[in-house]
Amino acid sequence: GFIGKGMLTAAVCGDIFASPSANAVLAAILAVSGPSGCLLIVKNYTGDRLNFGLAAERARAFGHKVNMVIVDDDIALPDLPQARGLAGTLFVHKIAGAMAENGADLDACTSNALRVINASRSIGMSLDTCTVPESPKENRIPYGMAELGLGIHGEAGIEQVASNGAADAISKVIDRLAATMPDGAHVVLINNLGAATVLEMSILTHSLLSSHIVDRIKFIVGPAALMTALDMHGFSVSVMALSTDDDTLLSQTTTAPAWPGCKAVAATLVLPLPDGLSPVRVPASAHEPTKAFLTKCCEQLIASKDDLNALDAKSGDGDTGSTLATAASALIDAMDSLPLADHTQLYRAIGLELSQTMGGSSGVLLAIFFAAAGDASSAGKPMREALQ
């Protein structure tokens, strides 16, 4: 996926979670190397280092110019003598590949690859390990837990932590990364380890760009499945401190099909509502008995969320309780802005609030109901008849 103009010229694969043989690496070197030479970009795993290193020595014996760099961007286990290579490798692929495409010589590409490696940091988190074909799955991560710092081959991480949603997961990852990040601008890469859904990755990315390091993040790559671990249900985050021209090299066009592009991070542009869509609200008014009654009703709906969802699941999609609880919470939050002392206006205000905060058929039906109740009340009907 990363072979193309402006990135890699070749990739050498072994069996699943096994390094390629030295002969396979040598064959690739001999097939693609010209007078300018060849740069091997290798993740820091023992088999890869040995086989690529041996192949490089053999290629040099044939008269080829071959350099090799080792990517060791994992920060999960700081006491490990040899840090593992993770998705920060993609920064090396892109920057060295763009430089080579622009005509830089082997030594310049190598020195910049080493600089990028030194500037890159990565860490991952997953809800589950991966399934290796023809091997029993290691179910070491209990339900409701996540493992922080595991490797791309399923290697154990630094600790297991409670799984408390996207914002909490990003916070745990970012806290580790932030401690190693120098001041200045960075690029971030958010990587799907294999089985996370598009929705999950989007939520994780939103949480990342809402975190306390966002002021230091100038560019983002992903979210995308860039360095996967088969069906691992997790993600990793990589950061790299930017130097001169790095943003240009990262943004440079490539024909490699798996590269998702590098985009500038910018604040979300929020536009005002067009004329006619901004709601016209009547002045708020206080009435404690009405407020207490409405609050009690809303609290009852919130408490009944799970029961209502279970009932709805028998014939529908199981979200009625969640929908009503969301609307009830919004109504409680808006309570002090409602015209509680004027029931006619209150019905209409509740309908307007529900139309804005409650989705699905329930929202529009209840909005119509309360609007009709407001009309009936304005026509002089008592509360019981207005609500029929």
Segments (PLM) and residue ranges:
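N-terminal loops that bind phosphate or other acidic moieties
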Residues: 1-388
